[in-house]
Regions:
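Helix-boundary and loop/linker segments of multi-pass membrane transporters
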Residues: 1, 40-47, 99-103
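Feature marks short, highly hydrophobic, charge-poor N-terminal signal-anchor/signal peptide-like helices
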Residues: 1-11
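Pore domain of cation channels
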Residues: 9-15, 19, 83-88, 97-139
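Alpha-helical transmembrane segments of polytopic integral membrane proteins
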Residues: 19-27, 64-68, 121-125
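Membrane-interface helix-loop junction between the first two transmembrane segments
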Residues: 20-42
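Interfacial helix-start motif at the membrane-water boundary
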Residues: 44-62
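Outer-pore turret/helix-boundary of cation channels
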Residues: 59-87
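Short, highly charged, low-complexity non-transmembrane loops/tails of multi-pass membrane proteins
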Residues: 137-147
Length: 147
């Protein structure tokens, strides 16, 4: 059990680092785009910011799921009836039907993945909300300037 917790904690930590890097990139990119899109209509500007944010976060989540699958492959952990990527995906999004469990004494790895996924998905929701707030604030400034 301790080895499962340590291994799961290590992969979770790496995933948190991936998400932190992606968060930093999103902040940099959205600030540059916000400045470069002053001439666009408000709707197009917000749409561009949100689209880029959601695409970047989706890429981060797929990479994080792939890291879980890679860990399972390296550790020789099998998931009955599915591949490791499908198993990792199901658990990361906390869907975890429960019909497939990790073999070889790694039964805790699924719940650890689910907790990791829930935290990172919640983090993504916070980023999306913050981008929307930032866009709304900038739109308010733009409207004040045009009056």
């Amino acid at each position: 059990m301790v080895s499962q917790l340590l291994a799961g904690g290590l992969v979770s930590f790496v995933n948190f680092c991936v998400h932190a890097v992606m968060t930093g990139l999103i902040v940099i990119i959205t600030r540059r785009i916000a400045g470069a899109t002053d001439d666009l209509h408000v709707f197009m500007r917000i749409t561009a910011l949100l689209t880029i944010t959601v695409i970047a976060l989706t890429v981060a989540h797929v990479l994080e799921i792939a890291l879980w699958a890679g860990f399972m492959k390296l550790a020789g952990i099998t998931a009955s009836e599915t591949g490791v990527f499908e198993f990792a995906f199901e658990n990361y999004v906390a869907l975890g039907y429960g019909d497939v469990v990790a073999g070889g004494g790694w039964r805790l790895i699924g719940p650890i993945m689910a907790l990791n996924g829930l935290l990172l998905i919640g983090w993504s929701v916070a980023i999306i909300f913050e981008v929307m707030k930032m866009a709304e604030f900038q739109v308010g400034l733009q409207e004040k300037r045009s009056r």
